[in-house]
Swiss-Prot record:
Signal peptide: none annotated. It comes from the Eukaryota. Heterodimer. The mRNA-capping enzyme is composed of two separate chains alpha and beta, respectively a mRNA guanylyltransferase and an mRNA 5'-triphosphate monophosphatase. Second step of mRNA capping. Transfer of the GMP moiety of GTP to the 5'-end of RNA via an enzyme-GMP covalent reaction intermediate. Keywords: GTP-binding, mRNA capping, mRNA processing, Nucleotide-binding, Nucleotidyltransferase, Nucleus, Transferase. The lineage of its organism: Eukaryota, Fungi, Dikarya, Ascomycota, Pezizomycotina. This is mRNA-capping enzyme subunit alpha. It is found in: Nucleus.
Length: 402
């Protein structure tokens, strides 16, 4: 049985729920959210394109840093005995049970009572603790709230209201708990923090202050529309910005090993005339996910460019001793426009969908640099101020006159 205490692996943050329990939990979450689907309900961003500069001028957006962690929904619920339990839900829709008594989320006016039917959106990261020679601590960084105490009306409220509910009803009572019982912190699975949000024109603040002060890796910015409701699945109003050269794609990798002719000596040793050479660098094909819309009803479509694997990289991959065939891999373009292996994405069931691939490729071809974002900030701010003034005037007109 796992003991309470900080998690050490953000990819395996607890005990994975067995299939039958996971199905039951998925149905619970769908019921709370009023959905017929039991699939992963989390919102997913689209890649930032040049057209989105106009979107930032036209609509109210918040901006935060894009953490290089793992996305989870935190589900606060009860077990069959009525005891407080929590699960982390990953993008594969697997449920990870946090060890009992490793977390507590008290109600605002009762430190013993706890939240249930509550779904929080965030990202799990490992922060490096300053002055500890590299010691890591897990943090759950919150950026949205889907449901509070079995009520999902929040889904239709704007982002600032959703975050306001999280702060008032969950985060402030949680912070008071830590202040009252600091001796319990070492036994907690992770610390919870609210992700710092700036108004969309606070881009310079993000680049100059927020990102340099982070204790974890960050690989871009996320812009989220203030006024739109929470959207299950791909949300066109959540914009993921990366510097054009840092854009990556998730593919399914398939390796084709060369056939070689046996030498005379190998034939004498009993080798067949031709055999597969698993030592040489294989041809690595990349495939994108297309649901059932691929060629001939296939789920996958061959990406036009292969994965380039250097000799030394192949030696490293072989030395891992792990299965390589058909794994999901995150790839980036190098200076010579070759796709290179960045990391394995075992946290994902599928490669990027063909629509995502098209979106990211457009971002790479027509990407917006950090300098262009900074230059756009002034116009974004001016437009925001004009909208804010109009809202203020409308509110004044609607007030009853005495």
């Amino acid at each position: 049985m796992e003991q309470p205490g900080p998690i050490t692996d953000i990819a395996k943050p607890g005990i994975k729920a067995p299939r039958d329990l996971a199905i039951s939990l998925r149905e619970e979450v769908a019921r709370i959210l009023g959905r017929s689907s039991i699939g992963f309900p989390g919102a997913q961003p689209v890649s930032f394109a040049r057209k989105h500069l106009e979107e930032l001028r036209r609509e109210d957006y918040y901006v935060c840093e894009k953490s290089d962690g793992i996305r989870y929904l935190l589900y606060l619920t009860v077990d069959e005995e009525g005891q407080e339990v929590q699960y982390l839900i990953d993008r594969k829709n697997d449920y990870w049970f946090l060890p009992r008594n490793s977390m507590h989320f008290p109600m605002p006016n009762d430190i013993q009572a706890f939240h249930r039917g509550t779904i929080i959106d965030g990202e799990l990261v490992m922060d490096t603790v300053p002055g500890t020679n590299g010691r890591k601590e897990p943090r759950f960084l919150v950026f949205d709230l889907l449901a509070l105490d079995d009520k999902a009306e929040l889904l239709n409220k704007p982002l600032d209201k959703r975050l306001g509910y999280f702060s008032a009803y969950i985060y402030e009572p949680y912070k008071k708990l830590l202040q009252q019982f600091p001796q319990e912190i070492p036994f907690m699975a992770f610390k919870v923090e609210m992700k710092r949000m700036e108004l969309s024109y606070g881009i310079e603040t993000m680049f100059r202050e927020v990102i340099p002060a982070l204790k974890h890796d960050s690989d871009g910015l996320i812009f989220t529309c203030r006024t739109t409701p929470y959207h299950f699945g791909t949300d066109p109003h959540i914009l993921k910005w990366k510097a054009p050269h840092e854009n990556t794609l998730d593919f399914r990798m398939r390796l084709n090993f060369p056939l070689v002719q046996a030498t005379e000596a190998e034939l004498d040793e009993g080798f067949p005339e031709q055999f597969t050479d698993y030592d040489s660098v294989p041809q690595a094909e990349l495939y994108v996910f297309c649901g059932n819309d691929g060629p001939g009803g296939s789920k996958y479509e061959l990406f036009p460019d292969p994965l380039y694997i250097a000799e030394d990289e192949w030696e490293t991959l072989k030395a891992l001793g792990d299965p390589l065939q058909d794994r999901v891999v995150e790839c980036c373009l190098d200076a010579e426009n070759r796709w290179r292996l960045f990391r394995f994405r075992d946290d994902k069931n599928e490669a990027n969908h063909t629509s995502t691939v098209s979106s990211v490729m457009a971002s790479i071809r027509d990407g917006v640099s950090d300098q262009e974002l900074l230059s756009a900030a002034t116009a974004i701010k001016e437009s925001w101020k004009i909208r804010a003034q109009k809202r203020k005037e409308q509110q004044q007109q609607q007030q009853p006159k005495h």
